[in-house]
Design a protein with these regions (language model features):
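N-terminal DNA-binding module of tyrosine recombinases/phage integrases
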Residues: 11-16, 22-118, 283
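DNA/chromatin major-groove-contacting recognition/catalytic segments
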Residues: 120, 189-192, 244-249, 335, ...
Length: 378
């Protein structure tokens, strides 16, 4: 005989049995324990006493969880889910799961001090890459700190106490020079490209002489090129993201969206020699430039692999696809472009980014300028 709703039963041996939830596993499934007594009243008294104790314990665990930074980190992430792009949300989640939570999540939020945060930042700058090959860039670390700061603000608004102050935390590390192809390497690459010139090589050529990003290249359609205006219009970017759907066949998916900043929406004038190289490949307006088809795409990873192959073919030192953008910008500075114009062509959100990143003299430019001193000194 069972007492409805009480989880109390009379056993065949005459004793009374009570069942109660003792805890929950990681999937949220209840774990049960059992109590026994000779009478219903006795087992019910035991059950009430244990349930009160369990409820107190569960409540205490909830309080402890709320004290941990991990709780506030994921609460902040949930609060951001609506109103941001999928790509932004996935980037936030990956940074939290791969970097922030493993190192800081276990600490009570009111125990995360400025010195602890400084050690965290220093470690990430020097040894933070997931593949073990060195540290994260200051830009990546700056983005990570933004997430941390925002989650702290969220926790403070909800009443959590914090002691960490972010002012003065240094993001400097031993600087690594950008990989820029030398003039000779650029000539070698061009020789490789014009041998059996195809759509993939055209893509590399376009990036080398416009500085567009790999995602922007892959999203380009023929309607984005105006031959009458001799210009290329950048209005989309392509990227591969993790698939949030647990039932999806594939773990990742390709998306094409607008660039993340308004400055990236831009029109770039094309030199005549670039227009001439592009024209033989023209297809229908909605076809993608790299595939020549409307329903077929070439994704960034494919272009990265193709580019690596061209470097090997030309006996050129290792570089990633983004080096084409650095090379374009560097050649423009060497040719005397004004920084404002270059900044707009590159799609930078501010001229300062262009100045900090590209306005530095090459050895050739230094030598050329030093030669100008000769008539003055002799």
């Amino acid at each position: 005989m069972a007492r409805t709703g009480e989880n109390i039963y009379k056993r065949k041996d005459g004793r009374w049995e009570a069942r109660y939830i003792s805890s929950y596993n990681a999937d949220g499934k209840a774990k049960y324990k059992y109590l026994y007594a000779r009478t219903y009243a006795e087992v019910k008294t035991k059950l009430i006493r244990v349930q009160n104790s369990v409820e107190t314990k569960v409540e205490a665990e909830k309080i402890r969880d709320r004290e941990k930074y991990e709780f506030w980190l994921f609460e902040w992430l949930r609060s951001k889910r609506i109103g941001i792009k999928d790509s932004t949300y996935i980037r936030y989640r990956n940074v939290i799961e791969n970097h922030i939570n493993p190192d800081l999540g276990k600490y009570p939020i009111n125990k995360i001090s400025t010195p602890l945060m400084e050690r965290f930042v220093s470690n990430k700058l020097n040894n933070g890459r997931l593949d073990g090959n060195g540290g994260l860039s200051p830009k990546t670390m700056s983005d990570m700190l933004t997430i941390i700061k925002e989650s702290f603000k969220y926790a403070q608004t909800a009443g959590a106490d914090t002691i960490c102050r972010f002012d003065g935390i240094s993001l400097k590390r031993n600087s690594q020079e950008m990989r820029v192809l030398s003039v000779f390497e650029q000539q070698q690459l061009i020789s490789v490209l014009f041998e059996d010139f195809d759509r993939y090589k055209l893509g590399v050529f376009i990036c080398l002489y416009t500085g567009i990003r790999i995602g922007e290249l892959c999203a380009l359609q023929w309607k984005n090129i105006s031959f009458s205006e001799k210009a290329i219009v950048i209005e989309h970017t392509m990227q591969r993201l993790q698939n949030d759907d647990p039932n999806a066949i594939y773990k990742t998916r390709i998306i094409i969206t607008e660039p993340k900043s308004k400055a990236s929406l831009r029109t770039i004038p094309l030199p005549d020699f670039v227009v001439k190289a592009i024209k033989p490949f023209v297809s229908s307006p909605n076809a993608y430039i790299l595939s020549g088809e409307c329903k077929s795409i070439v994704e960034p990873r494919t272009m990265q692999n193709r580019f690596k192959g061209y470097l090997e073919e030309g006996h050129i030192g290792d570089a990633n696809f983004h080096s084409l953008r650095h090379t374009f910008a560097t050649r423009c500075i060497e040719a005397g472009f004004d920084v404002k114009t270059l900044s707009e062509i590159l799609g930078h959100s501010s001229v300062k980014i262009t100045l900090d990143r590209y306005v530095h003299s090459s050895m050739e430019l230094k030598r050329s300028n030093m030669e100008k001193l000769t008539p003055i000194l002799v």
